[in-house]
Amino acid sequence: MTVIHTENAPAAIGPYVQAVDLGNMVLTSGQIPVNPETGEIPSDIVQQTRQSLNNVKAIIEQAGLTVADIVKTTVFVKDLNDFAR
């Protein structure tokens, strides 16, 4: 098992890592919409989603993968009315 870390995504805020490479798959931790350069969180759900996905992209690229390699995602939203956006 290899720990994956990039400065292009927010650091883990608990006792975990951004991702681990298990050899035949990479598992990422949950990502939040924090801009790793500024520490800011956008107020709009669309921008929050974009930032969270950019964070995932940065982590998997650090592991040598692309978004085309992602086989499963789970999305959590605070307000289901925002889901369609």
Please state what every model-predicted region is.
Residues M1-R85:
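Short, polar/acidic, helix-capping and beta-turn segments at strand->helix junctions
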